Every structure is written in C-alpha cells, then in structure tokens.
C-alpha cells in the first residue's frame, strides 16, 4: 500500500512539473541574449554611453521592425528603438526559422500561436495579453495553428523581451509566428486579424502606440558560404554591395509613407516566390515584414488616424559592428562574423503622419 501511495505521489509531482513547464515558455537562447536583470541594467547603461547620440521622436510611434541577432553584435541597433517603447502590451510577429521547419513542421499559410501562460523575462515572467485568446476564438481556424513546440524552438520573439521588459516591467505580449505564405494569403488573413485587433483596442479603449504596440522581428541579409548566399563574392567589395542593396530596399520601400502598393513591391524584392529579381537578399523576417505591414496598414486605415510613415533608426551588420566590448558579461555569440559569414540588421520606427 505504501509503495502505491509513493507512486501516486510521484505521479502527482511529475504531473505538476509538466503543467508548470507548459505554463511558462522556457528560454531558447541563453547565450546571445541577456536574461539577468542586473546585467541587463549594466548593458543598457553601457549602450547609453556608447551609442550614437541621435534622438528619435516617441510621439506618434506605433510600430517597428526590430533586429533579433545576438546582443553583443546588435546592441547598438536594438537600443535606440526600444528606449522609445513603453506600451502596456505588444503584439510581436516573429519568424518561422528553418530550425522550426525541420524540428517541428514545414508550416505554410498559417500564423502560429501558442498556449503558454507567460514567457520568461528578466524580472519576472512576462504575461500573455488577453488578445491572444480573442484571436483564437475569432480568427478563422484555417488561418492559424497552435503549437508550443514551434515557439519553444524559435528565438526571434524572445530576443525582444529583455529590452521590452527593461523599459516596462509589466508589459504583456501576444506572440505570433508567421509561416511562409503568398501575398494573397497574407491579405486574406490580415483582413480578419486587423479587425479583431481594432475591435479589441476599441473595446478596451487602447491607443495605438501608447497602450498597444506592434513589433516585427527580422534580421536582414544573411550573407556568405554558410547561407549559400554570396552572389557578389566574398571580399570587402562584395560586403559593400550587399549592404548597399539592403539599404536600397529599406529606403525604397520602408522609409516614407508606407502604402499597400509599396508593400507589394517590397514583396517582389524579398519573397522568393514573388520576385523576378536575379539577386534576392536573404532576410529571415521577410514573411513577418510583409504580413505585419499589410495588417498595420489596415489597422491604421480602420482607425482613420492618418498615414503610416517609416523612419530608419539604424542599419548595420555583424561584420561592421564586430563584438561590443561589454566587459564581465555572461552573454556570448551564437555565430561567427567574417566576410564569409555575416548578417545585416536594422531597426525602423513606423509613425502616424
């Protein structure tokens, strides 16, 4: 009898642990990102002293595209954006990287949601916004799937959490991964999702930008032999040509008034299935960018608050930045940098004009 009792206790303990492990989304990358509050404070202070002193306006900022690379590479690109954001809740559109497609499923034509109660943060667990469950209940079931494993394997959303929580310890998030899909499918899904979000905002008297913010996670061109992507070669001249192409795309399609036609033209530059270009830069967040901007444009239109204007905050890459000399850090690097392996990244703020 005692053996049975002990066995039942063990089952209860294991079950309780299982429930908890499903309740809090665990950290995927504990090398490239900072998960210690004191160290994050020191890192922000370091960035305050080392970053460019150019100031960007917080007023009318409603959304942004953010880098998600290692902090020791991209800290100076994260910092000038995230110090502008202190909304109560943030919708984050993340990437569905190749690791997810290999380890979980080759997702296509859907948004990927999750069931966690919260995500790990630097101070405490970051709570999930009620918006997530509203999306599940109102969005057509064919447009999304729910998969905790996919979110556990993916790193492009968690990368933004330490910066978000540093500036607002009580921030809530709605994490959404965007799978590969056509522009037509994106328009179809964003039409429904934008209405769900605007209805939620109106019902809760939330102001876009101040109370609820939209973030799109992306790293720009992944260049070099490891990515099977070196159309210009592998020398300094090739590096310059590749970053100039990134910057051209940003300036032609993301800076200034962002209208649906510009978004569709951007898709022709960065989506392989839409493009007729000979050279297509390997932006890992290409699907979240197109989807997020189509949806954001609809939200701005439905709220009748003006036009969407993009402003480049900072562009760089791992080869240019090298490694930040932030001393006594627990952080490290998850990939090398060289002319044979480098990644571009940028932050852009979207304002109401």
Predicted regions and their residues:
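Sec-dependent signal peptide recognition
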Residues: 2-10
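Active-site histidine-anchored catalytic micro-motif
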Residues: 22-298, 303, 316-321
């Amino acid at each position: 009898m005692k053996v049975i009792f002990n066995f039942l206790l063990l089952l209860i303990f294991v079950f309780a642990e299982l429930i908890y492990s499903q309740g809090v989304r665990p950290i995927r990358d504990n090398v490239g990102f900072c998960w210690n509050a004191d160290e994050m404070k020191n890192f922000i202070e370091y960035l305050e002293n080392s970053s460019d002193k150019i100031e960007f306006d917080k007023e009318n900022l409603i959304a942004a595209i953010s880098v998600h690379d290692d902090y020791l590479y991209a800290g100076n690109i994260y910092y000038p954006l995230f110090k502008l954001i202190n909304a109560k809740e943030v919708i984050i559109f993340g990437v569905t990287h190749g690791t997810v497609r290999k380890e979980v499923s080759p997702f296509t034509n859907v948004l990927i949601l999750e069931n966690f109660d919260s995500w790990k943060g630097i101070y405490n667990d970051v709570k999930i916004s009620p918006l997530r469950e509203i999306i599940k209940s109102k969005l057509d079931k064919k447009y999304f799937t729910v998969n905790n494993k996919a979110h556990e394997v993916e790193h492009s959303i968690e990368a933004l959490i330490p910066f978000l929580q540093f500036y607002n310890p009580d921030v809530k998030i709605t994490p959404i991964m965007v799978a590969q899909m056509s522009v037509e499918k994106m328009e179809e899904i964003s039409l429904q999702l934008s209405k769900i979000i605007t209805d939620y905002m109106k019902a809760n008297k939330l102001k876009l930008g101040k109370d609820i913010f939209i973030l799109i996670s992306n790293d720009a061109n992944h260049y070099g032999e490891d990515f099977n992507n070196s159309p210009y070669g592998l020398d300094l001249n090739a590096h310059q040509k590749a970053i100039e192409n990134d910057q051209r795309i940003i300036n032609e399609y993301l800076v200034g008034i962002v209208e649906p036609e510009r978004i569709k033209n951007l898709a022709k530059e960065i989506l392989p299935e839409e493009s007729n270009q000979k050279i297509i830069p390997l932006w890992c967040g290409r699907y979240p960018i197109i989807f997020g901007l189509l949806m954001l444009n609809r939200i701005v239109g439905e709220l009748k608050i003006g036009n969407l204007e993009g402003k480049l905050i900072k562009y760089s890459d791992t080869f240019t930045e090298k490694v930040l000399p932030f001393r006594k850090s627990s952080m490290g690097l998850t990939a090398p940098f060289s002319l044979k392996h480098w990644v571009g990244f940028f932050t852009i703020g979207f304002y109401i004009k």
